[in-house]
Amino acid sequence: MNPFLISVAAVALAEIGDKTQLLSLLLAARYRKPVPIIVGILLSTLLNHALAALVGEWIGRALGPDAIRWGIGISFLAIALWTLKPDKLDENDAAKSHGSVFIITFVAFFLAEMGDKTQVATVLLAAKFHALYAVVLGTTVGMRIANVPAVLLGKAAADRIPFQAVRLVAAGLFALLGAAALVTGG
């Protein structure tokens, strides 16, 4: 399995309908400045997922292969269930200050991503693959695939995306990854 491609697919699917994608829509609708929003999302994701991947690499080295296999398998199954539940984002959760759109986006995204399923997936992927750069780049590309169209197309696109169907596909992917980890160790 290619760590980069698995990371792209897992995070892109998990991000559909996620609170950070909803945050992208809110920021785009409120500020109507796609470039600083997109750059803020990129840099925030890189930092957040790099830190998450470092934690994952450390966990991967600190625990034995059997503990990693069981932890990853059970965690991916839990993420599959978590993915089925639609996220909600209250407009009050989005930054309301009049500061720089880039800084607002960077901080809001970094904080919204803390403990989010895509951050948890990044930790797990890094623990599994021991490929820090491939996982960070893959998860960042996955976030871009899901969030850039949300910023550029705004609410009109969100109304047309079949979120329930995408959530089912994403949940299925995480369930398959979890089952594969438990059954085959990989």
Language-model regions, residue ranges each:
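Short hydrophobic "helix-edge" motifs at membrane interfaces and signal-peptide entry regions
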Residues: 7-9, 103-107, 152
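Juxtamembrane helix-entry segments on the extracytoplasmic side of multipass membrane proteins
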Residues: 1-5, 66-68, 100, 130-134, ...
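Selected transmembrane alpha-helices and immediately adjacent juxtamembrane segments
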Residues: 90, 94-119, 125, 129
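Juxtamembrane boundary at the C-terminal end of a transmembrane helix
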Residues: 179-186
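Juxtamembrane transmembrane-helix termini in multi-pass membrane transport proteins
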Residues: 2-61, 121-142
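Membrane helix-loop-helix hairpins that form the core translocation module of multi-pass transporters
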Residues: 32-101, 149-160, 165, 169-172, ...
